[in-house]
Curated annotation (Swiss-Prot):
Protein name: Probable ADP-ribosylation factor At2g15310
GO terms under biological process: protein transport; vesicle-mediated transport
Family listed: Belongs to the small GTPase superfamily. Arf family.
Primary localisation category: Golgi
Amino acid sequence: MGARFSRIAKRFLPKSKVRILMVGLDGSGKTTILYKLKLGEVVTTVPTIGFNLETVEYKGINFTVWDIGGQEKIRKLWRHYFQNAQGLIFVVDSSDSERLSEARNELHRILTDNELEGACVLVFANKQDSRNALPVAEVANKLGLHSLSKRCWLIQGTSAISGQGLYEGLEWLSTTIPNKPERSTSVSSFRSDSYERKLVRGPRY
């Protein structure tokens, strides 16, 4: 009886709202990921000129996800969306090793912006279903993630087509992003390298 009442009550409780910015190089699969999370299916996409905005509900949290185009000429506009972002999803194509240095430069460039100082960083190492996909640990090294010693981050292997790893990423965001602005963001030293080609964790706030 009590459990049933609890389930009913949750339907009427206000949902937490979290603002997420999703960026990455063009062709990394950002928009496919967004609509896989939103609709549960793969949709036909075209290169994003501007942005896509959708709300994804997960475990009582409304994630407002801003998917920003990744073409080089658009990247200088990313900073206009940084304000009030509580989480950053950075999507990389694990199968395109030639562009990982470019992705690294863009990631570290935007993380110097004060507007993203408190944002948790979730890296989706996408296209893990590709024959040419690099192991997640190698992607993490090429992106220089272990140098982000003062920031909360996680890299998650994903496939936008099958949905592999996407909800694991949302789970991490839902348990990591502070629900209240005044909550402390001090670092507690934590890192686990048991990833099985899927997961590499950074320090947990």
